[in-house]
Amino acid sequence: QSFKNAEPGIKLCGREFIRAVIYTCGGSRWEGSPGMSSKCCTYGCTRKDISILC
């Protein structure tokens, strides 16, 4: 697979992660995923990664 066109991940920690999830999912309609917040903080997440929580 070629990752040249892949969306770059953005590191989101704490409040920034929660705000990104709420913005992407629309309000509080999202389910937690164990380890997702630490993954996004350490390695970065794409919009597609966050939309999995919706």
Swiss-Prot record:
Q: Does the keyword Magnesium apply?
A: no
Q: Identify the main location.
A: secreted
- Gene3D superfamilies from the xrefs? Insulin-like
PROSITE patterns given in the database record: INSULIN
Where Pyrrolidone carboxylic acid occurs, residue numbers? Answer: 1
Where does this protein reside within or beyond the cell? Secreted
Classification via Pfam families: Ins_beta (PF03488)
Keywords annotated in UniProt: Disulfide bond, Hormone, Pyrrolidone carboxylic acid, Secreted
A GO molecular function annotation here is: G protein-coupled receptor binding
Claim: Translocase is one of the keywords in the record: no
Task: Spell out the GO cellular component terms annotated for this protein, sorted alphabetically and separated by semicolons.
Answer: extracellular region
Family per record: Belongs to the insulin family.
As for what it does, the entry says: The function of relaxin in an oviparous species is not yet known.
Q: What is this protein called?
A: Relaxin
